[in-house]
Every structure is written in C-alpha cells, then in structure tokens.
Amino acid sequence: FDDDYEHFEQHMEQAIARVPALASTGVKQMINGPESFTPDGNFILGVAPECANMFVGAGFNAFGIASGGGAGWVLAEWVMKGEAPLDLWVVDIRRFSALHRDRQWVCDRTLEAYGKHYTVAYPHEEYESGRPRLASPLYTTLRGQGAVFGSKLGWERPNWFARDGQSPRDIYSMGRQNWFQAVGEEHRATREAVTLF
C-alpha cells in the first residue's frame, strides 16, 4: 500500500514522547501493507490436513517479524523429523473444525480477535462473538442453574456455576477472578461428596 503518514502520525507522536531523539531522526522507510489475523488470535503452523507434505506458516497476527525465527525453526524441525518438536496445539492448523468454514462466523470472530490484539489479555478470557453457536440439550437448564459458559470449537460448556446472589458472568482480572470461590466450592464438593460431570 502507499505510505500513510496521517495514519502513522499518532504512533510516531507516542514514540517521540517516549524517546525524544526520534523527533530528529525521521522516518527512513515505511512499510504499509495487509496483515493476517486468525479467529483465535494464534498463528497457523503445521501440515495442512487436506494436502500431504504441505506445511503452513501463516496468520501471525502482526507478530510475524518477532516470531519468525521460532516459527521457522519449529517448521524446519517438523519437516525434517516428521513431527513437531514440542506441543504446538494452540497454533496447529488442525485445531480448526467445520465451524471455521462459516465465513460470517470467521469474520465476526477474527474482528473480535483483532480488536483484542493490543488490549490487556486476561487469563481465561472468552470470546463473545458468534455465541452461542453449538449447545447441548442441557444448555438452557444449566444456564437456569447459574452456569457461566465458555466455548471450545463452537460448543458451549459450563466453566463454573454462579452462587446465589452472584452475577452469572465472568469478571476478568489479573488476580483471583470472580469465579474463584464458586469453583473452590465445586472442587470441595467433588472431593468430599458427589458431583456429576
């Protein structure tokens, strides 16, 4: 794309505020182009399931330069040895399912992932777009009993159950989150009494 100094200006101003010497150095080269983002904000690495011996390294979500060395090493090892050198499921291309063939769902979820890219990443944070997508017949019953759901591969499943008087929603933080006490009680019941999974 053409250089876009107007778009870049706010970032340059913030950089100069932190490193004043940048004001006199100027911009020598601008690279302005498209970037690829994925529905879960993670890379896509590994062997394409539909095409033997085709290895993929894509969807770096604006971290391609920073992650290129490690991703290149992992792919090289995978190609040479026939298996990944470590557990890469979070970025493995095989993590995608038939759900990811739904263009509207992918678009909505990828826009949400892009929107979260430069925000605070809280532990256990769930995506909200495209939900609920797939739910068991017990979904409504469990929700009525205070279930707070998360989503895995499109399937809604209860993460925890809100107690009486507690709002049935996640409140994210870097410390103990609002589900900590409720999950502790569920754990204690499982350990000392009977629970059904």
Model-derived segments and their meaning:
Residues 2-134:
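C-terminal catalytic lobe of FAD-dependent flavoproteins
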Residues 86, 93-197:
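Glycine/proline-enriched, intrinsically flexible loops and inter-domain linkers
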